[in-house]
C-alpha cells in the first residue's frame, strides 16, 4: 500500500515546481505516484483501488468538497492540502476530525514533507489494522525464534529439499513465519481470551454491534456447533432443514 495520488498540474510555477520536487522525494521514500485527470477520476480510483494511501491536492481548487467525497469512501485516508499564504481557511471542528494535513507551497522543503507523509502513512496503516493482525505482523517483523513453535522454524526447515523450496516459494515466507501456536505469549491466549485475542474479540463485537464475540478454531462448522450446543441443550427438540450444513448434523 504505497500509492499516493496528486491532483494537478496547476499551470503556475509557484505551485507546480514544489509539487514536482515532492514527487521525487516521495518516490525516494518508496511511494508510487499517480496523477488522476480530475476529481471524478480520483474518486473512481479510490473506490476500486484500496491500496491508495494518500491524496495531495490544492486547497484553493478543491477544498472541503473533495475531502467530504473521499471521506465517504475511506474516512481514514490521509489527505494533504497545499495552500498559499493567501488561502482562505474555512474549516470547522467537525471537518478537523478528518485525516487532513496542510502544507505550504515552498521550494526546498520536499524531503521534510515526504518524511512527514511517510509518518502519516504509517499511522494510517496502524489505525486500520485490527488488534490481532497488528500483533501478528509485529511478531513476524521482529523475527522472533521459538523453540517449540513453529516446528518448521519459520520455514527454514522446508528449504532443505527441492520440493520443500517449491512449497516455501508458493506460500511465501510470512505465511510460515506467522504459523504459530498458543505458546506465543505476545499474541495472547485463545483459550483464556487475553491479550491481542481479547482485543480482537472486543473489536469484532464493536464492528458488528454485538454484546460479545469469540474467536474459535476450525471454522464455521465448529462455530455452529458451539452456538448450537449452547442454544439447544440435551433433550431439546430441534427442527432443521434437510439440506442444512453438516455441522448441524454433527451437532445432533
What are these regions (language model features)?
Residues 101-194:
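N-terminal "arm"/small-domain region of PLP-dependent enzymes with the aminotransferase-like
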Residues 172-222:
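Conserved N-terminal alpha-helix of the aminotransferase class I/II PLP-enzyme fold
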Residues 212-236, 240, 246-250:
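Conserved beta-loop-alpha segment that forms the PLP phosphate-binding cup at the N-terminus of a helix
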Residues 30-38:
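Short hydrophobic/Thr-rich beta-strand motif most characteristic of the beta2 strand and flanking loop
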Residues 55, 59, 76-91:
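A short, hydrophobic beta-strand element within the central beta-sheet of small alpha/beta folds
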Residues 37-53:
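Acidic, metal-coordinating helix/loop segments flanking the phosphotransfer/catalytic sites
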Residues 64-74:
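Short amphipathic alpha-helix used as the core "switch/output" element in two-component signaling
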Residues 2-26, 55, 252:
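Conserved acidic segment of CheY-like receiver
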Amino acid at each position: 500500500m504505497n500509492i499516493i495520488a496528486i491532483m494537478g498540474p496547476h499551470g503556475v510555477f509557484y505551485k507546480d515546481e514544489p509539487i514536482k520536487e515532492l514527487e521525487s522525494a516521495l518516490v525516494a521514500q518508496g511511494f508510487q505516484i499517480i496523477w488522476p485527470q480530475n476529481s471524478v477520476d480520483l474518486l473512481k480510483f479510490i473506490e476500486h483501488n484500496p491500496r491508495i494511501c494518500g491524496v495531495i491536492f490544492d486547497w484553493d481548487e478543491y477544498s472541503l468538497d473533495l475531502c467530504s467525497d473521499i471521506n465517504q469512501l475511506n474516512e481514514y485516508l490521509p489527505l494533504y492540502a497545499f495552500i498559499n499564504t493567501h488561502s482562505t481557511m474555512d474549516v470547522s471542528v467537525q471537518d478537523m476530525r478528518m485525516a487532513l494535513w496542510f502544507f505550504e507551497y515552498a521550494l526546498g522543503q520536499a524531503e521534510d514533507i515526504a518524511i512527514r507523509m511517510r509518518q502519516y502513512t504509517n499511522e494510517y496503516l496502524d489505525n486500520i489494522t485490527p488488534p490481532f493482525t497488528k500483533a501478528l505482523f509485529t511478531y513476524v517483523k521482529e523475527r522472533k525464534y521459538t523453540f517449540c513453535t513453529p516446528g518448521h522454524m519459520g520455514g527454514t526447515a522446508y528449504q532443505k529439499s527441492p520440493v520443500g523450496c517449491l512449497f516455501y516459494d508458493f506460500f511465501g515466507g510470512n505465511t510460515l513465519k506467522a504459523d504459530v501456536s498458543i505458546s506465543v505469549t505476545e499474541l495472547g491466549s485463545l483459550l483464556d481470551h487475553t491479550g491481542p485475542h481479547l482485543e480482537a474479540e472486543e473489536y469484532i463485537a464493536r464492528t458488528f454491534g454485538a454484546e460479545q464475540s469469540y474467536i474459535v478454531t476450525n471454522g464455521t462448522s465448529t462455530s455452529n456447533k458451539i452456538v448450537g450446543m449452547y442454544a439447544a441443550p440435551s433433550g431439546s427438540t430441534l427442527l432443521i432443514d434437510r439440506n442444512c450444513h453438516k455441522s448441524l448434523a454433527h451437532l445432533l
